[in-house]
Each structure stands twice: as structure tokens, then as C-alpha cells.
Amino acid sequence: MTVFARIDHAANAAAVGLTLRPTVLVLFGNPTSGTVLMHDEQTAGLDLPMRALAWEDENGEYWLTYNDLAWLARRHDLGPDSAAMIHAMETGMASIARTVTGN
């Protein structure tokens, strides 16, 4: 997996004199996985690489939010050629979420 970008929205808010609870967007993925999906339907590139938002709510609890891979498959009308890759990506994303959140 490659981390392509990390965007600290709270730091960007502070840079313009605004406040925001910790909110970080991470763009990551595997070029092989993404290319398989884009071979099926090139518009999948709109939602790739994968992204996850780590953020703190008003109660001080931290959350990890990301797009559901089944949603991505429906959104881009991905066919059977992408099914195995979508499943592998779902499994990988669930593993990442468990690691990051400790759940």
C-alpha cells in the first residue's frame, strides 16, 4: 500500500485563523488494485486512490470514516471482472480500520 497524501484539515484551518477539531484525510492505495478497477470502468478513478478520514467528535471520541467499496462498485457500475478486487479491497480496508481503531 502506498500513502499518496495526508491532508491535515485542522492545520489548514489554523493557517487561516479558524479552528477545527483534529481532522486528517489520508489518500492511499495500491496502483495495481486501482488500475484493475479503472480497466473495468475508468470513472472509478474519481474515487481512487482510497481515502479515509480520521476525526475527533465533540465528545473527544475519534472516528475513522471511509467509503464503502460496494458503494464504489455500484457508483461506477463495475462488472464481474472487478468483483475479486473489490472483495480484496474490502478485506484490506476492514483490516486497516481494525488496526487504526483497535477494534
Identify the function of each model-found stretch.
Residues M1-N103:
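Feature detects long, helix-prone N-terminal segments enriched in hydrophobes
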